[in-house]
Amino acid sequence: MSVGFIGAGQLACALARGFTAAGVLSAHKIIASSPEMDLPTVSALRKMGVNLTRSNKDTVRHSDVLFLAVKPHIIPFILDEIGADVQERHIVVSCAAGVTISSVEKKLMAFQPAPKVIRCMTNTPVVVREGATVYATGTHALVEDGKLLEQLMSSVGFCTEVEEDLIDAITGLSGSGPAYAFMALDALADGGVKMGVPRRLAVRLGAQALLGAAKMLLDSEDHPGQLKDNVCSPGGATIHALHFLESGGFRSLLINAVEASCIRTRELQSMADQEKVSPAALKKTLLDRVKLESPTVSTLAPPSSGKLLTRNPAQGSKRE
């Protein structure tokens, strides 16, 4: 089995690094396409041994599982470009925020009657095999197709199937979640520095506190509130700190952040469905198209079947 990424940005780089680190795929069975070959992420993929090309069509031809790892407003253009090259063997996995299964299927059905589409939302901690991924299968995807993606994504963290109508909310929760954690960690470190702790040590201790708290929660059946209470002694420093957080609306800020991300995801969905693109984004898209028309620079390995993950496209049953 081979995996392709349309787009060679942060997500593609994180997934490729995670898959190779987990041992489920060797780098030569991964291909990524990008109109720009001087990006830091492209350099990182090259160092891993991943095949690189400027041609999205090459990526489709040399892959079985195809990740659409580009911005939502680019998806319609990409599907128009590669639709004729998508075959029955392909599992098309959309990772773009807000882009629905039906919108991808509608585009691809102009080229073939039963495209296998899966919508996926993951996050950047896949790079250290601690990602959080959910997926929903499309009309024509087989049960085995979903299980194959789940097996692949479970190698880089937690993965589970959900109904598609939950994915926008999950984008705001775990998709954007690492950014909330990094901002919180940055602020915790600032607090430590303010009180005299060296920056490097403050960052390390703050990160370890978040890591340890997450592990305690995942390894127990206790409610987060109970674990929080266990840290607070009567009249102690922690309860005074929590009072300060509560008075500043800490909980409401996090709730509102998840809501804001979810709402924006739905706005992106509407823009993608209507193929609305901002002038700046349109200019970049046109420039990328010009680059794609230039001679292809690629280092391609022939598609081959992997030993760890296999599937037979002739078998399986469609989801009801």
From Swiss-Prot:
Pathway given in the UniProt record: Amino-acid biosynthesis; L-proline biosynthesis; L-proline from L-glutamate 5-semialdehyde: step 1/1
Where does this protein hold L-proline? Answer: E164, A237, T238
One cellular component term from this protein's GO annotations in UniProt? mitochondrion
Q: What reaction is this protein's catalytic activity?
A: L-proline + NADP(+) = (S)-1-pyrroline-5-carboxylate + NADPH + 2 H(+); L-proline + NAD(+) = (S)-1-pyrroline-5-carboxylate + NADH + 2 H(+)
Record keywords, A-Z: Acetylation, Amino-acid biosynthesis, Cytoplasm, Mitochondrion, NADP, Oxidoreductase, Phosphoprotein, Proline biosynthesis
Question: Which Pfam family is one of this chain's hits?
Answer: F420_oxidored
Q: What class of enzyme is it?
A: oxidoreductase
> Which residues does the record give as NADPH binding sites?
A8, Q10, L11, S34, E36, N56, V70, K71, A97, N230
Top-level taxon of the source organism: Eukaryota
Q: Where is this region: Disordered?
A: 293-320
Entry EC no(s): 1.5.1.2
User: Which positions bear Phosphoserine?
Assistant: S304
What's one GO BP annotation on this UniProt entry? Answer: proline biosynthetic process
According to its UniProt record, where is this protein located? Cytoplasm; Mitochondrion
Q: Where does NADP(+) bind?
A: 6-11, 34, 56, 69-72, 95-97
> Matching PROSITE patterns, A to Z?
P5CR
Q: Which PANTHER family match?
A: PYRROLINE-5-CARBOXYLATE REDUCTASE, PYRROLINE-5-CARBOXYLATE REDUCTASE 2
Listed under subunit, the entry gives: Homodecamer; composed of 5 homodimers. Interacts with LTO1.
**Function as written in the Swiss-Prot or TrEMBL entry:** Oxidoreductase that catalyzes the last step in proline biosynthesis, which corresponds to the reduction of pyrroline-5-carboxylate to L-proline using NAD(P)H. At physiologic concentrations, has higher specific activity in the presence of NADH. Involved in cellular response to oxidative stress. In some cell types, such as erythrocytes, its primary function may be the generation of NADP(+).
- Which family, according to the similarity comment? Belongs to the pyrroline-5-carboxylate reductase family.
Q: What is the protein name given in its UniProt record?
A: Pyrroline-5-carboxylate reductase 2
